[in-house]
Amino acid sequence: MHSQFDHVSVVKKSNVYFGGSCISHTVQFEDGTKKTLGVILPTEQPLTFETHVPERMEIISGECRVTIADNEEHELFRAGQSFYVPGNSKFKIETDDVLDYVCHLEG
């Protein structure tokens, strides 16, 4: 896991979800790929995100509980781990601490 991205463009306007509980910025690479760098603040209820393209969520710091699609069981992910969500799907995520992540948009 690299600690920085080089040779990128960053969209200055932030993506704000759930009243500010999740904030990210889009990073565009020279080859046209995109990622978002974000933070999720502690949540009392799971946040539900819908995907349009496949996404790989890389946890940079913190830990979270994730439920993918219609699964009933959640999984715990910590810094250094990733989880994959298919396109045209959804996932629920919740955290008790500040969570830093990179969302790799793979579509």
Task: Please give the residue ranges for each predicted region.
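A generic structural motif
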Residues: Q28-E30, T67-A69, E94, E106
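Short, conserved beta-strand element in jelly-roll/cupin
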Residues: T51-V66
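A short, N-terminal "cap"/entry segment at the start of jelly-roll beta-barrel domains
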Residues: M1-L37
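Conserved short histidine dyad/triad with adjacent acidic residue
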Residues: Q28-H52, Y84-G87
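Ligand-binding loop in jelly-roll beta-barrel domains
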Residues: P86-G107
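Short loop/turn motifs at secondary-structure junctions and domain boundaries
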Residues: F18, L47-F49, V66-T67
